[in-house]
């Protein structure tokens, strides 16, 4: 069972990393970053259950990561909305805010 969950987590992490590297759209990049966070959370919960199922340290840490990821997504979407209002584009290569 452990191997299946780790393969799933590695697949999610790989898809998220590939999407983050190749994405030109900021929304897609944020979604891929969330995929990476979810893969890490799966690992936390899996290893916590595998090594010591009596303690919920991995699950508690995963809840903290989910809360931080939600805050990151909210701040990221707010920044993205401000960039779209100013630049009328959400492409990563067109979002150089140092030039006018």
UniProtKB/Swiss-Prot annotation:
Residues annotated as transmembrane: 1-21, 31-51, 60-80
Membrane topology: Multi-pass membrane protein
GO CC, alphabetical: chloroplast thylakoid membrane; NADH dehydrogenase complex
Pfam families associated with the record: Oxidored_q2
Keyword RNA-binding annotated: no
Sample GO molecular function, one term: quinone binding
UniProt-listed HAMAP family: NDH1_NuoK (MF_01456)
Identification of the protein by name: NAD(P)H-quinone oxidoreductase subunit 4L, chloroplastic
Provenance organism: Trachelium caeruleum
Gene: ndhE
